[in-house]
UniProtKB/Swiss-Prot annotation:
The active site is at 129. The gene is trmB. It comes from the Bacteria. Its EC number is 2.1.1.33. Pathway: tRNA modification; N(7)-methylguanine-tRNA biosynthesis. One of its GO terms (molecular function) is tRNA (guanine(46)-N7)-methyltransferase activity. This is tRNA (guanine-N(7)-)-methyltransferase. The keyword tRNA processing applies. Pfam families: Methyltransf_4. InterPro entries: SAM-dependent_MTases_sf, tRNA_(Gua-N-7)_MeTrfase_Trmb, tRNA_methyltr_TrmB_bact. It comes from Chlamydia trachomatis serovar D (strain ATCC VR-885 / DSM 19411 / UW-3/Cx). Keywords: Methyltransferase, S-adenosyl-L-methionine, Transferase, tRNA processing. It catalyses: guanosine(46) in tRNA + S-adenosyl-L-methionine = N(7)-methylguanosine(46) in tRNA + S-adenosyl-L-homocysteine. S-adenosyl-L-methionine binds at residues 54, 79, 106, 129. GO terms for cellular component: tRNA methyltransferase complex.
């Protein structure tokens, strides 16, 4: 199964949310998201197992590895670029992964329109774009509204993890998460990951360039 075997199920002018070939397409610049009736997680995965979600899935190395480790845990991979979605889909097929759903679209749109409260045991954000220029910071994932939305979708005791090579991004994200979640690590609330994080393509890329990898974890407590 090759990446190019996956085709977009619509032309741009006819775009609409739809699920095909284990991919949920959430198009940009669309105004009728609520018209799509989202299936239940049980219908999508054909089981009642716990669900974890990775954002910024890239080429899918990390999430496919996680899905293969434990078939009883369902995974959702969210990636906005279709060329990368194709690579995730190809890996999923070639490794015969049955506990993975790919979302092709913006994480914020997927969460706000299609993810119900207390859906996820864990959310992992792997190497998001740091948008380092000040004028671009409005595009960062870790802003108040979206962190609140991620918190909403976690079960009590659920975990939100961020891995990044950008220290300034890390510190800013921690500042936001401290408003809504409980830190899972002692102050300064992050660790330097030496190894054993996983097979992320971006992790391997930044390590090859001599970059440090940082990881932080936050927990949704009772009453939050």
């Amino acid at each position: 199964m090759k990446p190019q075997d996956l085709k977009l199920p619509y032309f741009w002018e006819e775009r609409s949310p739809q699920i095909a070939n284990h991919v949920f397409y959430v198009p940009n610049y669309y105004s009728r998201y609520e018209e799509f009736v989202m299936p239940t997680w049980q219908e999508l995965f054909a089981n009642n197992g716990p669900i974890c979600c990775e954002l910024c899935s890239g080429n899918g190395d990390w999430v496919v590895e996680q899905a293969l480790k434990d078939a009883s845990v369902n995974w959702i991979a969210v990636e906005k670029r279709f060329d990368r979605v194709r690579k995730i889909w190809s890996k999923m097929g070639n490794y015969r992964v049955n506990n993975l759903l790919i979302v092709c679209g913006e994480a914020q749109t997927f969460f706000s329109h299609y993810v119900s409260d207390a859906s996820f045991q864990k959310i992992v954000v792997n190497f998001p774009d740091p948008w380092p220029k000040f004028r671009h910071r409005k595009h960062r994932l870790f802003q108040d509204l979206f962190v609140q939305d991620m918190m909403r979708t976690l079960v009590v005791g659920g975990q939100l993890t961020l891995a990044t090579d950008d220290y300034n991004y890390l510190v800013n994200a921690i500042t936001v998460m401290l408003k809504y979640l409980s830190p899972g690590l002692k102050s300064p609330h992050y660790i330097n990951v030496k190894d054993n994080y996983g097979g992320s393509w971006f992790e391997n890329l930044w390590r090859s360039k001599g970059q440090e990898i940082f990881c932080t974890e936050f927990i949704k407590r009772v009453g939050i």
